[in-house]
Every structure is written in structure tokens, then in C-alpha cells.
């Protein structure tokens, strides 16, 4: 039986070494003159001094960790109980006692449903007052209290178990601006971004009353030059193709964030000190081809109003592309979308981390890599196309499924962990 306790983190990676076989069986990609049959290197884990502690092969990432049921066993379209259809879902989370919470910007409230899909209640409405929202972008639960992030008013509203408004939390900002982004861990705290006086964007960790716990000035952040996300100067900056979004999250009591090339992740403790680095071999993600660029150009022009297409075509005269696709994260190809998610879960006594692989091939369903806390690579999970994962629990995987007409539904897919359990027994000698 699958038993997973989950925490939704908005954005990125693990704290432990990755492994699918022993160190003796794994070598870096072969150099000239070496055995070409040596396993292809996937991940190399080092400490802050650069000392390698574990290497993992690519094959471990290619096996299936969980089978996803062909049909969702919970489907919510928003019309249950006389409600309006779902529109612009900002966040979905599993709540206590077998419930689901859906932060939805169309109705500007948080809907609560049971696992049959029946609508139980709605909290909040459009406005600026207590318990009202301007833009819903994040959800989190701590015991039976619900934390809801409003990016427009840069605040967090806390609701009790009966849906009653309790209080407002405004995270303190050492960077000189109010928070703009939200990640929640019921055991660690609240992670936000805020923009400083010079325009730099940094990460801040806060307690559940908004008090500042730590800042991470040396961690990669969206406006940090290490990220390479700032366009060239001039009226028409180059089109930045296939760039992964800034990725960071709370896990194992600290912050994990990416560096510039998207093949490297840094783990910082609660005090901001860099403890470990994961380097993903740049031999793994496939190269960007001329066909990839041409296809992205065609999609951009087709999605543009005919009157505006000449301007789009002029902008596409200057295109910047990386040599290879990023290893993980998400991107719309041209326009940055909401940050990709990181899902942390527990399976029995093991903690897992799910990381989204970069969607290099259009039309292929989103793929997630799954790791145990000790770094063992369970494998990957592939979901249907147009499905965005938000959380994992014993009930399955919940997220937003959008059809070709952009109609949204919140769905839950069952997960079959039989392969994971059999591998665990085999590794234990059972």
C-alpha cells in the first residue's frame, strides 16, 4: 500500500547523493582510450569543497518508478454544488482528513472538496480586506490550518479548520521589498522572494508568523547574473529560447537552488551556508537543433494575432539558444510561466523528492524524476500531456489537466508503486 505524506514546494532538488548501483560499478563517461561501454554518468554529488561523494548512472533515471493509472479516479471541473467552472487554477494541495484545496483565480477563492469530488466549502473572495484575495498563487497546510498566498497583496492569509479567517502574515523582507513568491514547508517555514533597492531578487526564509529566519545572498536567484536570465540591453532583446526557469525550494531544513547552466544544484542550510552541490552531466540532455528553433518560431507566430506577427518575426531575427536543453525545470519556450514545482513526499519510512525534467520534446507528457532521501534513484514518472503535477499523497498524484480548449480540471491519478517495492526488497536481500 502506498503511503505518501506530501509537501508541495514551488520549485527544486534533493539533498542526498544519487545512486542506482555501487560506486565500484559507476565511472564517469569514458575518455578517449577508455572503455566506451562504461556507464553514462548522470549525477555527481560533491561537498562545497568539490570532493565527490557519489556518482550515479543515467540508466537509473530512465526506469519507471511509478505507473500512473490510465484514468483519473477523481475529476473536479468546478461545477459541483452549483459552482462556476474552474478558471486559472493557481495552486492545488491535499488537505487534512482526505480533502482537496483548490486556489482558483476566476472565483478568487479557495474551494474545498472531498475525494469523491463533492464540493464542501469556499473561503475568500475578490477584494483587499481580511480573508479576501487579489491573486492566488500558493497553498499550504500546517496541522489543520490553511496558509494561502496572495501575490498581488504580498501577504498570506491563515484559515482555521472550519474555514474561518484567523490572521494575516506578511513576511518580513530584508531586501527592501514585499515578498513576490511563496513556497511552504510545514516543518521548515515559508520561502519568499523579494526585490531589493538595486533590483536584485533574493530568497528569504520566514517563520509561520512572518518573522525572518534567514536570507541566502549567495544562492542563485532569478536576477543573479549566475542565472543568465537577464536579456540583452536595447529595445528588442534577443529571444531567449529553451531557458529553464529559476528553481528553488525548501527541503531537508534548507534551501535548494539552481546555478546558471541548469546542470548544477546547490543545497544551503538554514543559515545560508552552502553544504552540497549536485552536478548533472551535460551529456544527458539532448542538443538543441535547428529543427527545435524552427518549430518554436512557428509556434510563436501561430499563437500571435495576425496584426502583431510582423513584430514577432522581427524579434525572432535575433535568437539565443543553449547548446543543450536544460536538465530539469520547465519553460514555455519563449514566455516564462509560473515556476515549476518540486514535490517532496514520504513513502513508508522513506522520504522522496520528485523533480520535473525539462520538457525538451513538445507533445510528450511531463516527466518527473523520483529520488529517495538517501539518494537512491527510484526512476521516473510520466504523466499525460497537459497535466501539471501539484502534490502527491496516499490518494495518488493531484494536479491540473487542461484540454485543447484550455478547459481546466483538477484530477487525481492513482500511482502503482509495485515496481518500487520489489526493487526495495531486492536491494534489502528480500
Residue ranges of each PLM-predicted region?
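N-terminal secretory signal peptides that target proteins for export/translocation
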Residues: 1-4
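Eukaryotic scaffold repeat domains enriched in small/polar residues
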Residues: 21-430
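Bacterial N-terminal signal peptides
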Residues: 7-19
